[in-house]
Swiss-Prot record:
A Pfam family of this chain: 7tm_1
Gene Ontology annotations for the cellular component aspect, listed alphabetically: brush border membrane; ciliary membrane; cilium; non-motile cilium; synapse
InterPro entries documented for this protein: Dopamine_D5_rcpt, Dopamine_rcpt, GPCR_Rhodpsn, GPCR_Rhodpsn_7TM
Lipid-binding residues (covalent, S-palmitoyl cysteine): 370
Any one Gene Ontology BP term: adenylate cyclase-activating G protein-coupled receptor signaling pathway
Chain intervals for the UniProt region annotation (Disordered): 416-446
UniProt record similarity statement: Belongs to the G-protein coupled receptor 1 family.
Keyword entries, A-Z: Cell membrane, Disulfide bond, G-protein coupled receptor, Glycoprotein, Lipoprotein, Membrane, Palmitate, Receptor, Transducer, Transmembrane, Transmembrane helix
PROSITE patterns, sorted: G_PROTEIN_RECEP_F1_1, G_PROTEIN_RECEP_F1_2
Protein's name according to its UniProt entry: D(1B) dopamine receptor
Start-end of Acidic residues biased regions: 420-430
Membrane topology, as annotated: Multi-pass membrane protein
Listed transmembrane segments: 39-64, 76-102, 112-134, 154-179, 216-240, 290-317, 336-357
Length: 478
């Protein structure tokens, strides 16, 4: 986002002046040739920008092309996220990359507009990530209410609010100059000479030395709260609760699998052997935890260092000879710029994290012309997707389990019949516990089998599609 405000120093001003004089005095009046470090920097930043563009364009194209993807309300938020990341790659990254390689800001008065774009696009990207986490939590914790309430209109209103807030904290303060530290900009300590103030030495031949801006403390803290700290707190809460819900559902459904496998083993072999379902359940829980850790870990690692520095810089003191050092120590411009690019790099990772579930991958394969190469063998994976967690497994073994359920679980009976034959049923149930009882209201008596098919036998099933279970381990009906 916004580069750091600096209490300018004479040393930095002299370096900028010397660099620009060297460029002006180059043979033929042209800029000096790029050094090895500049070439490497240009190559890396170009790759980052191109990857960000291609990844987010591919996400948008996949949703536009696929009717199935367009039908999901969640993908409205994915599109909004991809658009905000596209804007980062188009309106923010290229200009800063040129300035990094050139060593100065060559675009003059465009600086203020670029700063506004920077704040707007970065804030919109983060707010969209927050909305996705809230959307997934609602879908998983209250699925039936979510299906009724989460309409296209509601989704568009949520997206509009995110973009409106991003514009309000960017263009209005920047264009009205509310974001600058006026005292700092008027009273720079650094002088090019004993009489030349920093601002007058900031430009040479119409070329601005830098596009940095001194943020006032109020704007730095308030914008950081809105753009990062409040959204990240919401994301931590929602993903923690999602993990707990997923853990409960995985364990309940796994108990049905263990009961079926145990009974099948006892009847076929005449002896009961331990089954691997418990280990599989633990593996699934571990994968869910890893998935959520990746989502939060990537986001926090990319943005947290920048926003810590963004709040520290307005309070830092350069410790010049004119006064004692107070507040936080200032950070170097290079350090700050590195963390700025770390934050922007999050826009290149979002397409991988949020749009790489099986549904998206199929459309990606069609768009790229590699459908046969990408989907030859089913591999058990946990995908980070727009619906958060997806299991994609080979279903042969689970079809056998479902068939065992169909043959082994007794048909549903009325409450009167259950009281009469309670003792006989208890003997026939064998290893089945109370968690595997069939509810009297079950229409088919095969609800347990359906739950297994729902979890393991669909091509792509996510926690967003798993309905909450009743205390008897059956899905609620609307």
């Amino acid at each position: 986002m916004l580069p750091p405000g600096r209490n300018g120093t004479a040393h930095r001003a002299r370096l900028g002046l010397q660099r620009q004089l060297a460029q002006v005095d180059a043979p033929g009046g042209s800029a000096a040739p790029l050094g090895p470090a500049q070439v490497v920097t240009a190559g890396l930043l170009t790759l980052l920008i191109v990857w960000t563009l291609l990844g987010n364009v591919l996400v948008c194209a996949a949703i536009v092309r696929s009717r199935h993807l367009r039908a999901k309300m969640t993908n409205i938020f994915i599109v909004s996220l991809a658009v905000s990341d596209l804007f980062v790659a188009l309106l923010v990254m290229p200009w800063k990359a040129v300035a990094e390689v050139a060593g100065y800001w060559p675009f003059g008065a465009f600086c203020d507009i670029w700063v506004a774009f920077d704040i707007m696009c970065s804030t919109a990207s983060i707010l969209n990530l927050c909305i996705i986490s809230v959307d997934r939590y609602w879908a998983i914790s209250r699925p039936f209410r979510y299906e009724r309430k989460m309409t296209q209109r509601v989704a568009l209103v949520m997206v509009a609010l995110a973009w409106t807030l991003s514009i309000l904290i960017s263009f209005i303060p920047v264009q009205l100059n509310w974001h600058r530290d006026k005292a700092g900009s008027q009273g720079r300590e650094g002088l090019l000479s004993n009489e030349t103030p920093w601002e007058e030495g900031w430009e040479l031949d119409g070329r601005t030395e830098n596009c940095d801006s001194s943020l006032n403390r109020t704007y730095a803290i308030s914008s950081s709260l809105i753009s990062f700290y409040i959204p990240v707190a919401i994301m931590i809460v929602t993903y923690t609760r999602i993990y707990r819900i997923a853990q409960v559902q995985i364990r309940r459904i796994s108990s049905l699998e263990r009961a079926a496998e145990h009974a099948q083993s006892c009847r076929s072999r005449g002896a009961c052997e331990p089954d691997p379902s418990l280990r599989a359940s633990i593996k699934k829980e571990t994968k869910v935890f890893k998935t959520l850790s990746v989502i939060m870990g990537v986001f926090v690692c990319c943005w947290l260092p920048f926003f810590i520095l963004n709040c520290m810089v307005p309070f830092c003191s350069s410790g010049d000879a004119q006064g004692p050092r107070t507040g936080f120590p200032c950070v170097s411009e290079t350090t700050f710029d590195i963390f700025v690019w770390f934050g922007w790099a999050n826009s290149s990772l979002n397409p991988i994290i949020y749009a790489f579930n099986a549904d998206f991958r199929k459309v990606f394969a069609q768009l790229l012309g590699c459908s046969h190469l990408c989907f030859r063998t089913p591999v058990q994976t946990v995908n980070i997707s727009n619906e958060l967690i997806s299991y994609n497994q080979d279903t042969v073994f689970h079809r056998e389990i479902a068939a065992a359920y169909v043959h082994m679980i007794p048909n549903a009976v009325s409450s009167g019949d259950r009281e009469v034959g309670e003792e006989e049923e208890a003997e026939e149930e064998g290893p089945f516990d109370h968690m595997s009882q069939i509810s009297p209201t079950t229409p088919d008596g095969d609800l347990a089998a359906e739950s297994v098919w729902e979890l393991d036998c669909e091509e792509e099933v996510s926690l967003g599609k798993i309905s909450p279970l009743t205390p008897n381990c059956f899905h609620k009906t609307a």
